[in-house]
Curated annotation (Swiss-Prot):
<dbReference type="GO" id="GO:0006400">
    <property type="term" value="P:tRNA modification"/>
</dbReference>
<protein>
    <recommendedName>
        <fullName>tRNA uridine(34) hydroxylase</fullName>
        <ecNumber>1.14.-.-</ecNumber>
    </recommendedName>
</protein>
<dbReference type="Pfam" id="PF17773">
    <property type="entry name" value="UPF0176_N"/>
</dbReference>
<dbReference type="Pfam" id="PF00581">
    <property type="entry name" value="Rhodanese"/>
</dbReference>
<comment type="similarity">
    <text>Belongs to the TrhO family.</text>
</comment>
<dbReference type="InterPro" id="IPR036873">
    <property type="entry name" value="Rhodanese-like_dom_sf"/>
</dbReference>
<dbReference type="InterPro" id="IPR040503">
    <property type="entry name" value="TRHO_N"/>
</dbReference>
<dbReference type="GO" id="GO:0016705">
    <property type="term" value="F:oxidoreductase activity, acting on paired donors, with incorporation or reduction of molecular oxygen"/>
</dbReference>
<comment type="function">
    <text>Catalyzes oxygen-dependent 5-hydroxyuridine (ho5U) modification at position 34 in tRNAs.</text>
</comment>
<keyword id="KW-0819">tRNA processing</keyword>
<keyword id="KW-0560">Oxidoreductase</keyword>
<feature type="domain" description="Rhodanese">
    <location>
        <begin position="129"/>
        <end position="223"/>
    </location>
</feature>
<dbReference type="InterPro" id="IPR020936">
    <property type="entry name" value="TrhO"/>
</dbReference>
<dbReference type="InterPro" id="IPR001763">
    <property type="entry name" value="Rhodanese-like_dom"/>
</dbReference>
<feature type="active site" description="Cysteine persulfide intermediate">
    <location>
        <position position="183"/>
    </location>
</feature>
Length: 263
Protein backbone atom coordinates (compact mmCIF):
# COMPACT_ATOMS: atom_id res chain seq x y z
CA UNK A 1 0.00 0.00 0.00
CA UNK A 2 1.13 3.56 -0.68
CA UNK A 3 2.33 5.44 2.37
CA UNK A 4 0.66 8.85 2.05
CA UNK A 5 -2.94 9.35 3.16
CA UNK A 6 -4.90 12.03 1.30
CA UNK A 7 -8.15 13.32 2.77
CA UNK A 8 -10.77 15.82 1.70
CA UNK A 9 -13.61 17.04 3.87
CA UNK A 10 -15.96 19.95 4.41
CA UNK A 11 -18.61 21.00 6.90
CA UNK A 12 -21.08 23.84 6.75
CA UNK A 13 -21.34 25.13 10.30
CA UNK A 14 -21.24 28.69 11.71
CA UNK A 15 -17.65 29.75 12.45
CA UNK A 16 -17.68 33.28 13.86
CA UNK A 17 -14.17 32.58 15.15
CA UNK A 18 -12.74 31.68 11.73
CA UNK A 19 -9.76 34.03 12.06
CA UNK A 20 -8.68 32.63 15.42
CA UNK A 21 -9.30 29.09 14.21
CA UNK A 22 -6.98 29.73 11.27
CA UNK A 23 -4.03 30.28 13.60
CA UNK A 24 -4.85 27.23 15.71
CA UNK A 25 -5.18 24.90 12.73
CA UNK A 26 -2.06 26.26 11.06
CA UNK A 27 -0.04 25.48 14.19
CA UNK A 28 -1.49 21.96 14.44
CA UNK A 29 -0.84 21.18 10.79
CA UNK A 30 2.71 22.48 11.00
CA UNK A 31 3.41 20.43 14.13
CA UNK A 32 2.24 17.29 12.32
CA UNK A 33 4.20 18.15 9.15
CA UNK A 34 1.06 18.02 7.01
CA UNK A 35 0.64 19.67 3.63
CA UNK A 36 -2.50 20.80 1.86
CA UNK A 37 -5.12 23.53 2.05
CA UNK A 38 -7.57 24.50 4.79
CA UNK A 39 -10.24 27.07 3.92
CA UNK A 40 -12.31 28.72 6.62
CA UNK A 41 -15.25 31.10 6.43
CA UNK A 42 -18.16 32.09 8.61
CA UNK A 43 -20.16 29.37 6.80
CA UNK A 44 -17.76 26.51 7.60
CA UNK A 45 -14.57 24.61 6.76
CA UNK A 46 -13.23 22.91 3.62
CA UNK A 47 -9.89 21.10 3.70
CA UNK A 48 -7.55 18.83 1.76
CA UNK A 49 -4.59 17.32 3.59
CA UNK A 50 -1.87 14.78 2.96
CA UNK A 51 0.78 13.10 5.08
CA UNK A 52 1.50 9.92 7.04
CA UNK A 53 -1.74 8.27 8.16
CA UNK A 54 -1.03 8.69 11.87
CA UNK A 55 -0.47 12.43 11.47
CA UNK A 56 -3.56 12.91 9.32
CA UNK A 57 -5.76 10.95 11.71
CA UNK A 58 -4.36 12.89 14.66
CA UNK A 59 -5.30 16.18 13.00
CA UNK A 60 -8.84 14.98 12.29
CA UNK A 61 -9.24 13.65 15.84
CA UNK A 62 -8.25 17.04 17.22
CA UNK A 63 -10.79 18.72 14.95
CA UNK A 64 -13.53 16.35 16.08
CA UNK A 65 -12.91 17.35 19.68
CA UNK A 66 -14.69 20.59 18.71
CA UNK A 67 -18.42 19.81 18.79
CA UNK A 68 -18.92 21.70 15.53
CA UNK A 69 -16.74 19.14 13.74
CA UNK A 70 -17.66 16.01 15.69
CA UNK A 71 -19.28 14.32 12.70
CA UNK A 72 -16.57 14.99 10.11
CA UNK A 73 -16.29 12.11 7.63
CA UNK A 74 -13.25 12.67 5.40
CA UNK A 75 -12.90 10.91 2.07
CA UNK A 76 -9.63 9.00 1.88
CA UNK A 77 -7.22 7.90 -0.84
CA UNK A 78 -3.56 6.90 -0.94
CA UNK A 79 -0.52 7.98 -2.92
CA UNK A 80 3.21 7.28 -2.98
CA UNK A 81 4.14 10.93 -2.46
CA UNK A 82 2.60 14.05 -0.91
CA UNK A 83 0.69 15.78 -3.74
CA UNK A 84 0.85 19.26 -2.17
CA UNK A 85 3.84 21.58 -2.05
CA UNK A 86 3.01 23.48 1.14
CA UNK A 87 0.47 24.00 3.90
CA UNK A 88 -2.03 26.83 3.35
CA UNK A 89 -4.64 27.95 5.87
CA UNK A 90 -6.85 30.80 4.68
CA UNK A 91 -9.98 32.67 5.71
CA UNK A 92 -12.39 33.31 2.85
CA UNK A 93 -15.77 34.96 2.40
CA UNK A 94 -17.19 31.55 1.43
CA UNK A 95 -15.63 28.09 1.52
CA UNK A 96 -17.07 27.63 -1.97
CA UNK A 97 -17.91 30.91 -3.60
CA UNK A 98 -21.38 31.16 -5.13
CA UNK A 99 -22.15 34.84 -4.46
CA UNK A 100 -25.67 33.87 -3.43
CA UNK A 101 -26.01 34.89 0.23
CA UNK A 102 -29.47 33.38 0.72
CA UNK A 103 -27.97 29.90 0.34
CA UNK A 104 -27.00 28.83 3.87
CA UNK A 105 -26.38 25.08 4.05
CA UNK A 106 -25.81 25.18 7.80
CA UNK A 107 -29.50 26.09 8.17
CA UNK A 108 -30.73 23.10 6.18
CA UNK A 109 -29.66 21.07 3.18
CA UNK A 110 -31.44 19.42 0.28
CA UNK A 111 -32.02 15.66 0.48
CA UNK A 112 -29.06 13.52 -0.47
CA UNK A 113 -28.80 10.22 -2.30
CA UNK A 114 -26.19 7.62 -1.45
CA UNK A 115 -23.71 6.40 -4.07
CA UNK A 116 -25.29 2.93 -4.00
CA UNK A 117 -28.76 4.35 -4.57
CA UNK A 118 -27.62 6.55 -7.45
CA UNK A 119 -25.90 3.58 -9.07
CA UNK A 120 -29.10 1.56 -8.79
CA UNK A 121 -31.19 4.40 -10.23
CA UNK A 122 -28.83 4.79 -13.17
CA UNK A 123 -28.86 1.06 -13.80
CA UNK A 124 -32.64 0.82 -13.80
CA UNK A 125 -33.10 4.14 -15.65
CA UNK A 126 -35.43 5.75 -13.12
CA UNK A 127 -35.83 6.48 -9.42
CA UNK A 128 -37.92 4.43 -7.02
CA UNK A 129 -41.08 6.26 -8.10
CA UNK A 130 -40.48 5.61 -11.79
CA UNK A 131 -39.33 9.16 -12.54
CA UNK A 132 -36.55 9.80 -15.07
CA UNK A 133 -33.20 10.45 -13.36
CA UNK A 134 -30.67 12.94 -14.70
CA UNK A 135 -27.29 13.87 -13.25
CA UNK A 136 -26.19 17.51 -13.20
CA UNK A 137 -22.48 18.29 -13.04
CA UNK A 138 -21.82 21.45 -11.02
CA UNK A 139 -18.06 21.55 -11.67
CA UNK A 140 -16.11 23.76 -14.05
CA UNK A 141 -15.92 22.77 -17.70
CA UNK A 142 -12.32 21.52 -17.67
CA UNK A 143 -13.10 19.28 -14.69
CA UNK A 144 -16.04 17.76 -16.55
CA UNK A 145 -13.75 17.13 -19.52
CA UNK A 146 -11.58 14.88 -17.34
CA UNK A 147 -14.52 12.61 -16.57
CA UNK A 148 -18.23 12.66 -15.74
CA UNK A 149 -21.31 10.51 -15.39
CA UNK A 150 -22.63 9.17 -18.68
CA UNK A 151 -25.13 11.52 -20.37
CA UNK A 152 -24.69 14.08 -17.61
CA UNK A 153 -26.03 17.61 -17.91
CA UNK A 154 -23.10 19.99 -18.30
CA UNK A 155 -23.70 23.73 -18.59
CA UNK A 156 -20.02 24.48 -19.33
CA UNK A 157 -19.58 26.90 -16.47
CA UNK A 158 -16.10 28.28 -15.85
CA UNK A 159 -16.68 29.22 -12.20
CA UNK A 160 -19.32 28.39 -9.62
CA UNK A 161 -20.74 31.91 -9.59
CA UNK A 162 -22.05 31.12 -13.09
CA UNK A 163 -24.24 28.30 -11.78
CA UNK A 164 -27.23 30.42 -10.59
CA UNK A 165 -27.78 32.18 -13.96
CA UNK A 166 -27.21 28.89 -15.79
CA UNK A 167 -29.89 27.28 -13.65
CA UNK A 168 -32.36 30.04 -14.42
CA UNK A 169 -31.67 29.63 -18.15
CA UNK A 170 -32.17 25.85 -18.12
CA UNK A 171 -34.62 25.28 -15.27
CA UNK A 172 -37.52 24.30 -17.53
CA UNK A 173 -35.45 21.41 -18.91
CA UNK A 174 -35.30 19.86 -15.44
CA UNK A 175 -39.01 19.97 -14.65
CA UNK A 176 -40.65 16.61 -13.89
CA UNK A 177 -37.27 14.88 -13.63
CA UNK A 178 -35.34 13.64 -10.62
CA UNK A 179 -32.15 15.69 -10.62
CA UNK A 180 -29.02 14.51 -8.82
CA UNK A 181 -26.41 17.26 -8.55
CA UNK A 182 -22.83 16.16 -8.11
CA UNK A 183 -19.29 17.49 -7.84
CA UNK A 184 -15.88 16.28 -6.66
CA UNK A 185 -16.52 15.88 -2.94
CA UNK A 186 -19.99 17.23 -2.23
CA UNK A 187 -19.50 20.89 -1.38
CA UNK A 188 -20.62 22.47 -4.67
CA UNK A 189 -23.54 20.12 -5.18
CA UNK A 190 -24.77 20.86 -1.65
CA UNK A 191 -25.20 24.54 -2.44
CA UNK A 192 -26.47 23.77 -5.95
CA UNK A 193 -29.19 21.43 -4.71
CA UNK A 194 -30.44 24.00 -2.20
CA UNK A 195 -30.61 26.65 -4.92
CA UNK A 196 -32.55 24.33 -7.23
CA UNK A 197 -35.04 23.65 -4.46
CA UNK A 198 -35.38 27.37 -3.81
CA UNK A 199 -36.03 27.89 -7.53
CA UNK A 200 -39.02 25.55 -7.36
CA UNK A 201 -37.61 22.23 -8.57
CA UNK A 202 -39.18 19.54 -6.41
CA UNK A 203 -37.25 16.35 -7.12
CA UNK A 204 -33.68 17.40 -6.41
CA UNK A 205 -30.95 15.49 -4.57
CA UNK A 206 -27.25 15.93 -4.00
CA UNK A 207 -24.87 13.00 -4.39
CA UNK A 208 -23.66 12.33 -0.86
CA UNK A 209 -19.88 12.70 -0.77
CA UNK A 210 -19.62 13.55 -4.46
CA UNK A 211 -17.67 11.63 -7.08
CA UNK A 212 -14.95 10.58 -4.66
CA UNK A 213 -17.44 8.87 -2.35
CA UNK A 214 -19.11 7.27 -5.39
CA UNK A 215 -15.74 5.81 -6.36
CA UNK A 216 -15.11 4.70 -2.78
CA UNK A 217 -18.45 2.94 -2.28
CA UNK A 218 -19.29 1.58 -5.76
CA UNK A 219 -17.51 0.09 -8.75
CA UNK A 220 -17.65 3.41 -10.59
CA UNK A 221 -20.27 2.17 -13.07
CA UNK A 222 -21.94 4.80 -15.29
CA UNK A 223 -18.99 7.17 -14.83
CA UNK A 224 -16.61 7.72 -17.75
CA UNK A 225 -13.02 8.90 -17.23
CA UNK A 226 -11.34 10.19 -14.09
CA UNK A 227 -12.13 12.75 -11.41
CA UNK A 228 -10.02 15.91 -11.60
CA UNK A 229 -8.38 16.79 -8.28
CA UNK A 230 -6.60 20.01 -7.40
CA UNK A 231 -3.22 18.63 -6.45
CA UNK A 232 -0.24 17.01 -8.13
CA UNK A 233 -2.14 13.78 -8.78
CA UNK A 234 -4.22 15.69 -11.37
CA UNK A 235 -6.95 13.02 -11.55
CA UNK A 236 -8.00 9.77 -9.88
CA UNK A 237 -9.93 6.84 -11.31
CA UNK A 238 -12.71 4.70 -9.91
CA UNK A 239 -10.10 2.81 -7.86
CA UNK A 240 -8.97 6.17 -6.38
CA UNK A 241 -5.52 5.65 -7.88
CA UNK A 242 -3.85 8.24 -10.10
CA UNK A 243 -5.14 8.19 -13.67
CA UNK A 244 -3.63 10.16 -16.57
CA UNK A 245 -5.29 13.19 -18.12
CA UNK A 246 -5.49 13.57 -21.87
CA UNK A 247 -2.68 15.84 -23.18
CA UNK A 248 -5.16 18.40 -24.50
CA UNK A 249 -6.73 18.99 -21.10
CA UNK A 250 -5.68 22.30 -19.51
CA UNK A 251 -3.46 22.44 -16.47
CA UNK A 252 -4.80 24.45 -13.55
CA UNK A 253 -2.75 25.60 -10.55
CA UNK A 254 -1.51 22.57 -8.60
CA UNK A 255 -2.55 23.84 -5.18
CA UNK A 256 -5.42 26.33 -5.28
CA UNK A 257 -5.99 28.99 -2.66
CA UNK A 258 -9.70 28.69 -3.44
CA UNK A 259 -11.85 25.57 -3.17
CA UNK A 260 -11.75 22.87 -5.87
CA UNK A 261 -13.31 24.16 -9.05
CA UNK A 262 -12.18 27.69 -8.23
CA UNK A 263 -14.98 30.21 -7.87
Amino acid sequence: MSDILNISCYKFTPLPDAAALRDTLAERAQALALKGTILLAEEGINFFLAGPAQAVHSFVDQLRADDRFADLAPKESWSDTVPFRKMLVKVKREIIRMDHPTIRPAEGRAPSVSPATLRRWLEQGHDDEGREVVTLDTRNDFEVDAGAFKDTIDWRITKFTEFPPALRAHKAELADKTVVSYCTGGIRCEKAAILMRDEGLEHVYQLEGGILKYFEETDGAFYDGGCFVFDERRAVGADLAITPLAPAEPLEPIQPTSPPGKA
